[in-house]
Structure formats: structure tokens, C-alpha cells
Amino acid sequence: MSILNGKPLFSLSIKASDVRAFIEVNGIYVHTVNSSSGSSSVEIPVNHYFHPETNYLGVVVFPLAEGEKRSAKSTVNLTLSVKSDENPNNKYDIAEIEYRASQDDPSGYNGSNSPVFLSSIDAFAEKDEGDVVVHPVVVDDSEGISISRKIEVPNSLPVWGFFESDDLPDYFRISKDDYARDKDALYEIYKVIEQSLSVGEVDEILDLFEERNRETDQAFYLDQGETRDSLKQSFLSSVNNENIQLLESDSIKFGLRPEPGRKLVRFIRADRRGAIAFNFIGEEGSVRYDLVFRKQDGEWIISR
């Protein structure tokens, strides 16, 4: 049986050097590469962003600032792999995207110009009757450099809520009033969380994270309620830690960071990091919690 029909665990291996870039899965920036003067390597799980049929991966290299020159050594390598939750020792590579500043045409060094078929029941070997289809890359250099790839990989994961949610506006182009309307709506939800945490009432807010917690349990084959319990313990640890203090703020300190697919939006502070912040007392640093929202039928839902 194909591991895709069991309990697949998808991950991205990201290796980069002398470059700044976003890594994108299905219209969501799942990782930011900031290796502008050195190398980095990381592997991240992506089940909670994956679709059960068709998925899109991308590398978006930051555009150059005026007067800035890109190092000829700039590279990004992105590899999608899968393993079974029941047998994690065997990992299989499915698709790859690569960026090399030293070469002009990413299409030329990113594999075939025709779809490639892989067989998930035969160690993802290339076969004409394969059930996995890796499409050629698409390159867009209108703003920075974007290299994306479509992958048809039928699997047993459910359709996550954000795939079917309302399209969000382009927050970089809408009016100030429309932007403020959505920001204020998310701030009201944030404020409920902040007020509860300020008095240590963690149980009062866990239901706001119901979709996030439930879908995380499903994505990684956890027991029902495990992610909820983990979030509760993390909040309690922060609330009871005498070395950190909840940062309470009015709405002017916050903003919106939309995901490129316009299905999710992050509610962030002015430093572009997670909205819920516990600052260390007497020293720099903080403990942060992300708030990532979607909208369905007019209702804002914490999705991730």
C-alpha cells in the first residue's frame, strides 16, 4: 500500500546561502530564509498546510533594494519529502526547487520541461503510470524572483478549513478605512485573549483556538485534545513565569500581514512578530504566540 494512503508526514528541507527568501506552500509563507551573509539549513513539517490532492511549492527571492547587489553565491534548495508516521526511518524525496544566482534561467536547471510521474508504491521511482505528478517550474521575475511548482500528490489528509474560506482583500491596496476595519475586528479577538491571560484565566480562551488545535491534532496524528492541552500548558507556563510579563497594548501597536494566497492573515505587532507577547523583565527577548486568522461567512476564525 502507498504510504500516501496511510499516515504520511510531509516535510520541506531548506538549504540556503547568501540570500533572503520566502518559502511558500499553497499560498502561505511557511518559512523565511535570512542567510544574507552565510548558510542555513532547516527542515519543517508541512502537513497542516498540505492539500489532499494538488499542492503548490514556491521560493520567492527578495527583490534587491536600490543600489544592492546580489551575491553570485546566492542559492536556495527546497526539497519536499514524505515518510510514514508508522515507519519514519524511510523518507522519500518527491520534488525539488532550486535557485542559483550564478545562472540566469531557473527553468533550465530545475528538471524536465514536461510533467514527471512518480510511483508512491514503488519508492517514488519515475514511472509512466505513477500516481504522483511533478510539474515543471514556473518562473516570475516581475518582483524579485519567484520559482513555483505544482505537484499532484493524492494523500489521506483532510481538506483544511482555510482552503475553503473566504478570499481576503489585498491589504496592500485597500483603503485605510477597510484595512482599519479588519484590523480592529482582529484586535477585539486579541484583546479577549490578552485580558484573560492578564488574570491567568487560560481555560476561558482555549475555545478560540479550537480549529487550530483540532486540525493540528489531525495533521500530525495526535490524540484528540493533545494540541489543546499543549497550548494550555504553554500559556500557563508563561503566565506563571516570574521572569516574563504579558505585554498589554492598544490597537495602534498592531498590523496585518496577509499570506500571498489571500486565505490567511497574521495579526502581528509592529516588529512583525506574533501578537501575544510575554517580554522578559530587565532584558531583551520575549515569548511569542502567533495568531493566524481566516474568514468564513463573515466570521473570523483562528486557523493556525
Predicted regions mapped to residue ranges:
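Beta-strand-rich recognition domains
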Residues: M1-A21, V60-V202, L208-E226, S230-R304
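Short strand-turn-strand beta-turns centered on an Asx-Gly dipeptide
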Residues: S17-G38
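A generic "functional-site adjacency" signal
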Residues: H48-Y49, Y187
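Exposed aromatic-hydrophobic patches
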Residues: S41-H48
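Short, well-structured beta-strand segments within conserved domains
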Residues: F50-V61
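Short, glycine/acidic-rich beta->alpha junctions
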Residues: L4, S37-S41
